[in-house]
């Protein structure tokens, strides 16, 4: 059967959301991991948000007039981010995923780089991305739990303010070589970003500490990263934190485990194009 790749339309949104839910639920269940979405409706809401966002390039795969998959390219900043890419479970292993990936790679070929994060237990997607030029850069774990405790002397943690964005951009440039302010500014309104302030300076930020997929964080030091996470935890009541943590950052990993976080699943950061080993302390989002 032939497969056509085209731009997503409004009438595709519900189908794409249901496919997204079933695809992630199927692969997670096969490996005894919890699903990424609590319901089909949650995945449909994500599909609608991505389609409506002018800074996200959204495409579908269509076969015999039926939508069988979709993919997205986030275009907020210099580095592009892929995902989610999902294929109807009954239509997988037919080359559709490769075509969807080739389309977003072509779209992002003029950018500094393209990155993604995949479930480490999904051997099929790992092989596909590697064959398309993506290199494994970082082993990750998704963590969830409650971190609470006394902040180090002289550090304040509070919600982000307009005047903090320039400092956050500088933190990102120092850590990664590029900034992510457009992404930080355009988070959904129901998510709150936070900063840690020491000596009148912003020394850390975390963009969505209660929603791991959209959370990215950078800090001058591991102490500042621990402070911003603990400070957010203290402000969060019973709401748990969730984030992706690079497991090579062994001290931060052990600190997180000691302070109430638990590992939910392993993931892998992959990159195509420009990449520099991060400096300081950082947490990636599901994009990069």
Predicted segments with their positions:
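Intrinsically disordered, low-complexity, positively biased terminal segments
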Residues: 1-3, 10, 56-58, 62-64, ...
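Active-site acidic-Proline motif in GNAT/NAT acetyltransferases
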Residues: 75, 88-90, 94, 221
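Conserved catalytic-core motifs of GNAT/GCN5-like acyltransferases
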Residues: 78, 113-119, 135-148, 263-275
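Active-site rim helix/loop that mediates acceptor-substrate recognition in acyltransferases
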Residues: 17-58, 62-70, 173-193, 197
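Surface-exposed beta-loop interaction hotspot
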Residues: 140-166
């Amino acid at each position: 059967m032939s497969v056509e790749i085209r731009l997503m339309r409004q009438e595709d949104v519900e189908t794409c959301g249901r496919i997204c839910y079933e695809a992630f639920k199927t692969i997670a269940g096969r490996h005894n991991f919890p699903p990424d979405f609590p319901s089909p409706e949650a995945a449909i809401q994500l599909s609608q948000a991505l389609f409506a966002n002018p800074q996200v390039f959204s495409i579908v795969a269509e076969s015999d007039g039926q939508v069988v998959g979709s993919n997205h390219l986030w275009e907020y900043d210099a580095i592009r981010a892929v995902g989610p890419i999902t294929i109807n479970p009954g239509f997988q292993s037919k080359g559709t995923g490769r075509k969807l990936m080739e389309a977003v790679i072509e779209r992002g070929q003029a950018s500094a780089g393209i990155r993604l994060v995949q479930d480490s237990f999904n051997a099929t997607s790992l092989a596909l991305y590697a064959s398309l030029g993506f290199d494994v850069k970082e082993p990750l774990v998704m963590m969830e739990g409650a971190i609470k405790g006394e902040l180090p002397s002289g550090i304040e943690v509070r919600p982000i303010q307009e005047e903090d964005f320039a400092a956050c951009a500088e933190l990102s440039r120092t850590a990664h070589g590029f900034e992510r302010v457009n992404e930080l500014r355009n988070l959904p309104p129901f998510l709150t970003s936070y900063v840690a302030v020491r000596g009148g300076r912003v020394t850390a930020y975390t963009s969505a500490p209660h929603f791991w997929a959209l959370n990215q964080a950078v800090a001058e030091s591991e102490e500042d990263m621990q402070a911003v996470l603990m400070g957010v935890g203290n402000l969060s009541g019973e709401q748990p934190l969730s984030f992706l943590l690079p497991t090579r950052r062994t001290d931060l990993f052990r600190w997180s485990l000691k302070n109430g976080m638990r590992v939910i699943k392993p993931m892998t950061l992959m990159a195509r194009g420009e990449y520099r080993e991060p400096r300081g302390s950082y947490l990636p989002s599901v994009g990069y």
